[in-house]
């Protein structure tokens, strides 16, 4: 009897082990939900959008004090609209996403999220984000956010199955967040009052952002050209497997960024801003030249990573070297 009791105690796992075993599925489930949410909203893209909106608001405000409550509200609303557009994009592309290894695990492509639930998130995010940008900023900024959504979801996404020109259209959608920030910071009113300097700087920054996207996305298109081909997406590296046209567009865009850097620096008279932006653009040109000559995965990967550094430098210089701001006093 004593032996049986002893064996029973030996065979029975401690209560803490049972508790740990019961907790593991819940932890794994939470991680899975967080991973799915991250894939749906694509936080890195959303962060890039928010940085551009903030930079535009900062440049537009000039020497005026920013309303930081408005800034936070506009950024939050923009992030929600961006998340909505990302989910809508994945709904429309769920069939092609299943054909590519890099996107096959997305929640909609893998069937972990229903279309109905996804559309509810899209509608709620669009309405909520639009309203937030309107309340925190103004109606014009909210309409710019709506136009960005329409261009990305309604034009760029279907064009990927039709023509390589999709990149040029997608770059417009990628640069439009600059307009959200400019409108939210009362850029049109300043323009009507005769102050064109801030608007010129913002326009130059928007142009830089538009041009920046060509080398960036051509590098991605080259690295995943086989997957895009399997999904029958009309990327330039699919329709022209040699990569010459993709390399040419990358190099032309990078070259055009150098004079635009000067236009961005003129309003503030900041030599440091011009030199920083021009130097970053020159490096971008050199890396694009390397890709044009080699047209291999290594040169494309170097171009891709360089593009991220160039974007960071451009946005940082736009904020750091622009007109000084008054950061004290009332923010309301």
Segments (PLM) and residue ranges:
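Juxtamembrane boundary at the C-terminal end of a transmembrane helix
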Residues: 316-332
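Topogenic membrane-insertion module of multi-pass membrane proteins
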Residues: 1-95, 118
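Membrane-embedded alpha-helical segments that form the functional core of polytopic membrane enzymes
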Residues: 51-59, 63-94, 102, 126, ...
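Cytosolic, membrane-interface loops and tails of multi-pass inner-membrane proteins
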Residues: 17-32, 92-113, 218-245
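Intramembrane alpha-helical segments
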Residues: 115-187
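Small-residue-rich segments of transmembrane alpha-helices in multi-pass membrane proteins
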Residues: 51-54, 107, 169-185, 245, ...
